[in-house]
Design a protein with these regions (language model features):
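Phosphate/adenylate-binding glycine loop and adjacent helical scaffold
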Residues: 1-55, 73-181, 185, 189-190, ...
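Long, compositionally biased low-complexity repeat segments characteristic
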Residues: 56-60
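Glycine-biased, low-complexity coil/linker segments
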Residues: 63-64, 85
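Amphipathic alpha-helical elements of HEAT/ARM-like alpha-solenoid repeat scaffolds that form extended
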Residues: 209-214
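Long, charge-rich alpha-helical interaction segments
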Residues: 229-241
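Membrane-interfacial catalytic/cofactor-binding modules of polytopic membrane enzymes
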Residues: 241-264
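Acidic, carboxylate-rich catalytic segments that either coordinate divalent cations
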Residues: 261-323
Length: 323
C-alpha cells in the first residue's frame, strides 16, 4: 500500500530546497513558493503532501538554523514515520523532488495517481442559502463559546477582552479592533494594513483574520455572482509582506483555494446538520494556538457583515467597492 495519501492540486513539478521544519511539518521552497510535507493530523491542502503515519521531529519548535540527521523513513505500507537524528546544515537536508507522478522525500520515492490529488475547490450551490445561513448562525455561536481565550473571537463577544490583560495584549487587541472597524466601515485597505502582521507566531493573528476574509469573499462571489476578485487582489497587495508563511496562505485564500479543514467546514455550512457543523468547527478551531479561530473570525464577520442590510446612516461599504 502506498504511504502517500494526497498531493495538493497547486503543487508543481520541480526540485524544492529545505526551508524549515516543525513537529508535524517539513517545509520546502522554490521560487518563493512553499510546499509542505505533513502527516495526517495536519491533513490535505493545496500545497500539502500528506504521508501516512507520524513524524518524529523534535523539538516541537521549528528551526531553520539546522536540521537533525541522518534521515530514515520507518515502516512501510500503512505506517511511515520520519526519524531525524544528529545535526546537519539546512543545505544537507535532501531536497524534495516532485514530478507529475512521484515525490522523493528524505531519499524515499513515493508514487501517486490522479486519484490522490487533493482538490482545493468545490462547487457551491446557491440553492442551499437557507441551510447556509442557518448553519452560519450556529457557527457564530460556536466561535463565541469555544474559541481559545486569546483568539480574535473578542470581535464577536467583547466580554472576551478581559482575557487580554498585559499592556502588550491590550495594545494588540486595540489595534485589531481598530483594523476590523476600518475594514467594515469604508476604509478597507487602511484596515488591512492595520491588521497586517499584527500578533505573534508563524502566521500572526491579523494575517489569519485577513485570510478568513479572503475566503469569505470568494464564497460570496460564488453565491451572489458579485465581482469580489478585484477587491481580493487589492487586499492581498496591501497584506503581502516579508513572511513567506503568511504570503503563501494569503495567496491561496485570495484565489479561493482551501485547505482540508476549511473546505470541510464550508461543505457542512452549505449542506450539513448542526452536529456536522459542530464537528467541522471543532477541527478548524484546533489549528494552532489560535490560528484556526482567528481565520474563522475573519470569515464569519465578513459573511455576516456583507449579508446584513445597510442601515440608514451606516458607513459600512460593500466590499465589491474598494475603499
Amino acid at each position: 500500500m502506498n504511504s502517500l495519501l494526497s498531493v495538493g492540486d497547486q503543487i508543481e513539478s520541480g526540485i524544492y530546497r529545505f526551508h524549515s521544519r516543525f513537529n508535524r511539518v517539513v517545509n520546502f521552497e522554490r521560487h518563493g513558493r512553499l510546499v509542505s510535507v505533513v502527516d495526517e493530523q495536519i491533513g490535505p491542502g493545496p500545497l500539502n503532501i500528506v504521508l501516512r503515519g507520524g513524524f518524529s521531529l523534535s523539538p516541537s519548535e521549528g528551526e531553520r538554523a539546522g536540521v537533525r540527521g541522518p534521515f530514515s523513513l520507518q515502516g512501510s505500507g500503512a505506517h511511515c514515520a520520519l526519524k531525524v537524528r544528529g545535526t546537519l546544515l539546512p543545505s544537507a537536508f535532501p531536497p524534495l523532488k516532485i514530478t507529475t507522478s512521484s515525490v522523493v522525500f528524505a531519499a524515499h520515492r513515493f508514487t501517486f495517481s490522479l486519484r490522490q490529488r487533493y482538490h482545493s475547490t468545490f462547487d457551491f450551490d446557491p440553492g442551499n442559502l437557507h441551510c447556509f445561513h442557518h448553519n452560519l448562525s450556529i457557527f457564530g455561536e460556536l466561535l463565541t463559546e469555544c474559541a481559545p481565550s486569546k483568539s480574535l473571537a473578542f470581535l464577536l463577544d467583547e466580554t472576551r477582552l478581559k482575557n487580554f490583560r498585559s499592556g502588550f495584549e491590550q495594545a494588540f487587541a486595540d489595534r485589531i479592533c481598530r483594523g476590523a472597524h476600518q475594514v467594515f466601515h469604508g476604509h478597507l485597505l487602511e484596515g488591512i494594513r492595520s491588521l497586517k502582521g499584527c500578533g505573534l507566531g508563524l502566521t500572526p493573528s491579523g494575517d489569519d483574520f485577513i485570510a478568513g476574509l479572503l475566503i469569505a469573499l470568494n464564497l460570496l462571489q460564488e453565491l451572489r455572482g458579485q465581482a469580489f476578485q478585484p477587491t481580493a487582489d487589492a487586499i492581498f497587495g496591501a497584506a503581502e509582506g516579508d513572511n513567506i508563511f503568511s504570503n503563501t496562505f494569503l495567496d491561496l485564500a485570495r484565489r479561493g483555494l482551501l485547505f482540508g479543514r476549511m473546505k470541510d467546514l464550508l461543505i457542512e455550512l452549505m449542506t450539513g446538520s448542526e452536529a456536522s457543523v459542530r464537528k467541522a468547527t471543532g477541527k478548524l478551531l484546533a489549528i494552532g494556538a489560535s490560528s484556526g479561530a482567528d481565520l474563522a473570525t475573519g470569515f464569519f464577520l465578513t459573511v455576516h457583515e456583507q449579508s446584513r442590510p445597510v442601515e440608514r446612516g451606516c458607513q459600512r461599504q460593500p466590499m465589491d467597492r474598494i475603499g
